[in-house]
């Protein structure tokens, strides 16, 4: 299905008259804030909110929602020296007293019980991933770097906050998340400010904050000298299909440095675009709580995302009525990670993350051809839940056109890249259907039109070639 671009309703930053590269640059520079009621995202500067006010907002109500729900909720300063509490008003005046030293869902997280269901191996290869169809997360404990085709810039225990700051530069802007509100802090911090906070004693930190989006692909030493696991590089479809001569640079989502203080918590989410994730812990520890991407779990997840009070609803206990029966998420379990562990999260898995102690992690995202059906399913959920463009996989549609073009021209690689037991017919059917919808959207949407690569020639002619190829392979038409 086609994507509808999300934009700030108070400005024309994403109007059709602006070039796509300008949109990307603007998104990278702009701070956003989301209304907790209507879920619409706004540019902070369009709202004319004073800079010193932004970090004090706990629950934001946009101008359209203020008449119905009242003014935004701000932090309240506690007069008690030893306990720091936020008071947040919810539906019809209900009030929650929230300890700012930990997220209010953390108790539920820590007490969750479920039978762990992962694959534990010592060497990750493309062959293994395809043979197991990536049905479960994969853990490589204390991974042998050379055996897994991975390389760190220096020893893992030497990758400290000081080393990261030296590599990136202390004036590097940083998106910092406030753990209690699960909102980004505005204005962005500088890395030197984060270093000071990260090195502050736990008891002296005013709030729990988290950094999960520092992309380091082009950072000397830290990113440039880091090599992703070979299996990840072998399966990353963007690596395979992106044309180096393209006027747009490929998306930078392959190498992130995550820095989390003790008791950081990220609520349930699915990684953007249904990407798979590799994750290696350098110091500290992490605990994940997973739910598999079954049809029911994804339906519950989508409904949960649309709840006005989503932040205060514990996803594992969320219920909806389906076929006259109440259903709730099933199959949940936790996984603990320690320094040296390498971890793979398959496409579409719903997860929350807790940090039991200060930690530094390097990880990244990647699309695959074998996960195309799930990736498009997650893309549709993102569209239906109105996830803003800045939080989605960059140039997603362009990547899909290039993927189709590549495999049409390298047909002998298609089955080997999806695995012998994978349903290639379903993959091509879903991919072609998406491209047909996107082509239709491009007739009225300039952004969609720009994302169709010129290298494929006339899009409709190319789609007909794809249909003919699929029919030759499987004897069916879309």
Swiss-Prot record:
<keyword id="KW-0805">Transcription regulation</keyword>
<keyword id="KW-0408">Iron</keyword>
<dbReference type="InterPro" id="IPR011011">
    <property type="entry name" value="Znf_FYVE_PHD"/>
</dbReference>
<dbReference type="GO" id="GO:0006338">
    <property type="term" value="P:chromatin remodeling"/>
</dbReference>
<dbReference type="InterPro" id="IPR041667">
    <property type="entry name" value="Cupin_8"/>
</dbReference>
<keyword id="KW-0560">Oxidoreductase</keyword>
<keyword id="KW-0156">Chromatin regulator</keyword>
<feature type="binding site">
    <location>
        <position position="286"/>
    </location>
    <ligand>
        <name>substrate</name>
    </ligand>
</feature>
<dbReference type="Pfam" id="PF00628">
    <property type="entry name" value="PHD"/>
</dbReference>
<dbReference type="GO" id="GO:0032452">
    <property type="term" value="F:histone demethylase activity"/>
</dbReference>
<dbReference type="GO" id="GO:0005634">
    <property type="term" value="C:nucleus"/>
</dbReference>
<keyword id="KW-0862">Zinc</keyword>
<comment type="similarity">
    <text>Belongs to the JHDM1 histone demethylase family.</text>
</comment>
<dbReference type="GO" id="GO:0140680">
    <property type="term" value="F:histone H3K36me/H3K36me2 demethylase activity"/>
</dbReference>
<feature type="domain" description="JmjC">
    <location>
        <begin position="217"/>
        <end position="383"/>
    </location>
</feature>
<dbReference type="InterPro" id="IPR041070">
    <property type="entry name" value="JHD"/>
</dbReference>
<keyword id="KW-0479">Metal-binding</keyword>
<dbReference type="GO" id="GO:0008270">
    <property type="term" value="F:zinc ion binding"/>
</dbReference>
<dbReference type="InterPro" id="IPR001965">
    <property type="entry name" value="Znf_PHD"/>
</dbReference>
<feature type="binding site">
    <location>
        <position position="351"/>
    </location>
    <ligand>
        <name>Fe cation</name>
    </ligand>
</feature>
<dbReference type="Pfam" id="PF13621">
    <property type="entry name" value="Cupin_8"/>
</dbReference>
<keyword id="KW-0863">Zinc-finger</keyword>
<dbReference type="InterPro" id="IPR003347">
    <property type="entry name" value="JmjC_dom"/>
</dbReference>
<dbReference type="GO" id="GO:0006357">
    <property type="term" value="P:regulation of transcription by RNA polymerase II"/>
</dbReference>
<keyword id="KW-0804">Transcription</keyword>
<protein>
    <recommendedName>
        <fullName>JmjC domain-containing histone demethylation protein 1</fullName>
        <ecNumber>1.14.11.27</ecNumber>
    </recommendedName>
</protein>
<keyword id="KW-0539">Nucleus</keyword>
<feature type="binding site">
    <location>
        <position position="269"/>
    </location>
    <ligand>
        <name>Fe cation</name>
    </ligand>
</feature>
<dbReference type="InterPro" id="IPR050690">
    <property type="entry name" value="JHDM1_Histone_Demethylase"/>
</dbReference>
<keyword id="KW-0223">Dioxygenase</keyword>
<feature type="binding site">
    <location>
        <position position="266"/>
    </location>
    <ligand>
        <name>substrate</name>
    </ligand>
</feature>
<dbReference type="Pfam" id="PF17811">
    <property type="entry name" value="JHD"/>
</dbReference>
<dbReference type="GO" id="GO:0003712">
    <property type="term" value="F:transcription coregulator activity"/>
</dbReference>
<dbReference type="InterPro" id="IPR019787">
    <property type="entry name" value="Znf_PHD-finger"/>
</dbReference>
<feature type="binding site">
    <location>
        <position position="271"/>
    </location>
    <ligand>
        <name>Fe cation</name>
    </ligand>
</feature>
<dbReference type="InterPro" id="IPR019786">
    <property type="entry name" value="Zinc_finger_PHD-type_CS"/>
</dbReference>
<feature type="zinc finger region" description="PHD-type">
    <location>
        <begin position="5"/>
        <end position="68"/>
    </location>
</feature>
<comment type="function">
    <text>Histone demethylase that specifically demethylates 'Lys-36' of histone H3, thereby playing a central role in histone code.</text>
</comment>
């Amino acid at each position: 299905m086609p994507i509808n671009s999300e934009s700030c309703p108070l400005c024309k930053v994403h109007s059709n008259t602006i070039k796509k590269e300008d949109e990307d640059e603007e998104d990278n520079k702009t701070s956003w804030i989301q209304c907790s009621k209507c879920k619409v995202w706004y540019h902070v500067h369009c709202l004319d909110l004073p800079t010193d006010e932004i970090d004090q907002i706990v629950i934001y109500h946009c101008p359209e929602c203020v008449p119905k729900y009242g003014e935004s909720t701000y932090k309240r300063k506690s007069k008690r020296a030893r306990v720091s509490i936020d008071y947040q008003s919810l539906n019809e005046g209900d009030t929650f007293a929230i300890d700012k030293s930990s997220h209010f869902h953390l108790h539920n997280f820590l007490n969750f019980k479920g039978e762990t269901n992962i694959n534990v191996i010592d060497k990750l290869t493309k062959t293994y991933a395809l043979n197991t169809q990536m049905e479960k997360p994969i853990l490589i404990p204390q991974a042998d770097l050379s055996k897994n085709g991975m390389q760190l810039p220096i020893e893992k225990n030497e990758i400290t906050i000081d080393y990261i700051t030296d590599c990136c530069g202390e004036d590097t802007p940083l998106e910092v998340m406030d753990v209690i509100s699960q909102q980004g802090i505005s204005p962005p911090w500088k890395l030197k400010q984060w270093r000071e906070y990260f090195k502050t004693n736990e008891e002296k930190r005013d709030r729990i904050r988290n950094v999960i989006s520092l992309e380091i692909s082009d950072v000397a030493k830290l990113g440039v000298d880091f090599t992703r696991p070979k299996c990840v590089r072998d399966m990353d479809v963007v690596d395979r299909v992106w044309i180096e001569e393209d006027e747009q640079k490929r998306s930078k989502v392959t190498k992130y440095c995550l820095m989390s203080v003790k008791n950081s918590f990220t609520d349930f989410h699915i990684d953007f675009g249904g990407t798979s994730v590799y994750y290696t812990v350098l110091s500290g520890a992490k605990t994940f709580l997973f739910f598999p991407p079954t049809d029911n779990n994804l339906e519950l997840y989508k409904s949960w995302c649309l709840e006005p009070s989503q932040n205060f609803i514990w996803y594992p206990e969320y219920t909806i009525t389906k076929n006259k029966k109440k259903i709730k998420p099933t199959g949940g379990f936790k996984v603990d990670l320690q320094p040296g562990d390498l971890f793979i999260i398959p496409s579409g898995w719903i997860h929350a993350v807790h940090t039991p102690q200060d930690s530094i992690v390097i990880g990244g995202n990647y699309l695959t051809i074998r996960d195309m059906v799930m990736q498009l399913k997650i893309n549709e959920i993102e569209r239906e839940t109105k996830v803003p463009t800045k939080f989605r996989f960059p140039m997603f549609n362009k990547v899909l056109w290039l993927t189709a073009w590549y495999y049409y021209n390298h047909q002998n690689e298609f089955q080997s890249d999806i695995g012998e037991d994978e349903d290639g017919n379903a993959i091509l059917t879903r991919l072609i259907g998406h491209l047909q919808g996107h082509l239709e959207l491009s007739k009225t949407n300039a952004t969609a039109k720009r994302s169709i690569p010129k290298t494929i020639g006339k899009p409709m002619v190319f789609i007909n070639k794809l249909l003919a190829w699929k029919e030759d392979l499987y004897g069916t038409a879309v």
